[in-house]
Amino acid sequence: PSYVIALLADRDLSSAGITAQLGGATARVAAGPAAIAQRLDLPLYAVSIHYEPLSGERRRRAASPWGLVLTASPVPAPQGPKGRERVVAHTRAWVAELGPSIAEHAADWHMLQPVFDADLDQDRLARSHAREQQEHP
């Protein structure tokens, strides 16, 4: 049997977060999905969901004017030795894969906190990272 494990890969403002370009802006994202894929030698997919208006029979059967579209795209693992650099490259690749979907369906992207580095308090972020380094050298 085959299994799919969905992981919410959200922003990661810790010093372990990986900077990646999302829609032309820098964001800090979680390394977890790429790290797990690498560690277990499993494929990684970028998955997006957006709404689409329904009409006719589809609308009647759904009992809703809206339908959900789920798109899954494989994100090939980068070549080279395993380790942090490969996790960083793989993470940036899945963010790049999701970027166009988010741009195309921005109204369906619900983020309730700042995502982009430009929107963060940089002094607070630096203090947080310094604290992490002191606690976990």
Enumerate the language-model features and the residues they cover.
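Non-catalytic C-terminal accessory region of glycerolipid acyltransferases
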Residues: 1-137
